[in-house]
Amino acid sequence: MSPTTDRIAVVGGSISGLTAALMLRDAGVDVDVYERSPQPLSGFGTGIVVQPELVHYLLEQGVELDSISVPSSSMEYVDALTGERVGSVPADWRFTSYDSIYGGLYELFGPERYHTSKCLVGLSQDSETVQMRFSDGTKAEANWVIGADGGASVVRKRLLGIEPTYAGYVTWRGVLQPGEVADDVWNYFNDKFTYGLLDDGHLIAYPIPGRENAESPRLNFQWYWNVAEGPDLDELMTDVRGIRLPTSVHNNSLNPHNLRQFHSKGESLFKPFRDLVLNASSPFVTVVADATVDRMVHGRVLLIGDAAVTPRPHAAAGGAKACDDARTLAEVFTKNHDLRGSLQSWETRQLQQGHAYLNKVKKMASRLQHGGSFEPGNPAFAFGLPKVDEPSVVTNS
């Protein structure tokens, strides 16, 4: 098998973009990554549940799972106001963080062909190449472009005009270091994934690795608020400069009124959850939104991950889906076969998986956000991707 001799550009340098670029480069493909951020990404240390697809590449490179994740033994379901235990099921999930996964991938890829401050503003293609134009006035050309630029994908918008649709709620995120809450609170959440159930929204909390392989883990939490689209959402997403932001308001940009409201609402929670909310040093808020496409292959431009199907986070496999898109697409390009036929097979399989996953997390949200029955251990709400067949490779024979 021989890889393509075409040059490939990856727009978006997060986890899926780096996974695709690394697998392509390892197979001898000429590949560059273009990232809109002015520096390598941080993800603010947010937590991720480990799925096989997410860590597949890192483990192949000899990275030890223990060095990038922490274990757990159960999933706990409690009333987030009273602390009443709703249920518990054994579970051996491992938890990691965005900075652990991204940092490992970025270190392997290196900075030489990872181009920062490259915000895509123009995209065109002909029968042989794709032309890209960036906001800094530079241009680039490749035989293929992989759009891996996330839920707010510029590539998808340029191709299809599709933007994410607000799901009706936001998530507040926070990460706590050892010592920022009392030991009893720390132990309450350690070694488990905890659902805090409410009639109007829900919380989750779980441990994640320390920064840069520090021995002591951190605690990660999310609190999902239902917020009506319109004035209420606009106020929440308007930063201290008076600018209405579309996706996230980071801690140093939060309007003080909104931060006070976050803390005020946190006062009503069961003590362990309350202490997470009140002691998080850098909470921030992000809208939850969906987007989907009917095609991932658009001539010489290909969409993967959240740039193709943007799911809600409730089944803990959005990153895994993105990495699976990246891995299977890289395999299409690095095998000697009918490329167009194999791309069609790849697209069919990945769309089937992406659409099934999106439907699953919407059903989970309909219960979690509105006080519906969320039975402990219900397999319909299990973490992970739907099972679909591997894409077939179409040969020329």
From Swiss-Prot:
<dbReference type="InterPro" id="IPR054707">
    <property type="entry name" value="DhpH_subs-bd"/>
</dbReference>
<feature type="binding site">
    <location>
        <begin position="35"/>
        <end position="36"/>
    </location>
    <ligand>
        <name>FAD</name>
    </ligand>
</feature>
<keyword id="KW-0614">Plasmid</keyword>
<protein>
    <recommendedName>
        <fullName>2,6-dihydroxypyridine 3-monooxygenase</fullName>
        <ecNumber>1.14.13.10</ecNumber>
    </recommendedName>
</protein>
<feature type="binding site">
    <location>
        <position position="49"/>
    </location>
    <ligand>
        <name>FAD</name>
    </ligand>
</feature>
<keyword id="KW-0520">NAD</keyword>
<feature type="binding site">
    <location>
        <position position="120"/>
    </location>
    <ligand>
        <name>FAD</name>
    </ligand>
</feature>
<dbReference type="InterPro" id="IPR002938">
    <property type="entry name" value="FAD-bd"/>
</dbReference>
<comment type="function">
    <text>Catalyzes the conversion of 2,6-dihydroxypyridine into 2,3,6-trihydroxypyridine in the nicotine degradation pathway.</text>
</comment>
<dbReference type="GO" id="GO:0018663">
    <property type="term" value="F:2,6-dihydroxypyridine 3-monooxygenase activity"/>
</dbReference>
<dbReference type="GO" id="GO:0050660">
    <property type="term" value="F:flavin adenine dinucleotide binding"/>
</dbReference>
<keyword id="KW-0285">Flavoprotein</keyword>
<keyword id="KW-0547">Nucleotide-binding</keyword>
<dbReference type="InterPro" id="IPR053212">
    <property type="entry name" value="DHP_3-monooxygenase"/>
</dbReference>
<keyword id="KW-0560">Oxidoreductase</keyword>
<dbReference type="InterPro" id="IPR036188">
    <property type="entry name" value="FAD/NAD-bd_sf"/>
</dbReference>
<comment type="pathway">
    <text>Alkaloid degradation; nicotine degradation.</text>
</comment>
<dbReference type="Pfam" id="PF22607">
    <property type="entry name" value="FAD_binding-like"/>
</dbReference>
<dbReference type="GO" id="GO:0042803">
    <property type="term" value="F:protein homodimerization activity"/>
</dbReference>
<feature type="binding site">
    <location>
        <begin position="316"/>
        <end position="320"/>
    </location>
    <ligand>
        <name>FAD</name>
    </ligand>
</feature>
<dbReference type="Pfam" id="PF01494">
    <property type="entry name" value="FAD_binding_3"/>
</dbReference>
<feature type="binding site">
    <location>
        <begin position="14"/>
        <end position="16"/>
    </location>
    <ligand>
        <name>FAD</name>
    </ligand>
</feature>
<feature type="binding site">
    <location>
        <position position="306"/>
    </location>
    <ligand>
        <name>FAD</name>
    </ligand>
</feature>
<dbReference type="GO" id="GO:0071949">
    <property type="term" value="F:FAD binding"/>
</dbReference>
<dbReference type="GO" id="GO:0019608">
    <property type="term" value="P:nicotine catabolic process"/>
</dbReference>
<keyword id="KW-0274">FAD</keyword>
<comment type="subunit">
    <text>Homodimer.</text>
</comment>
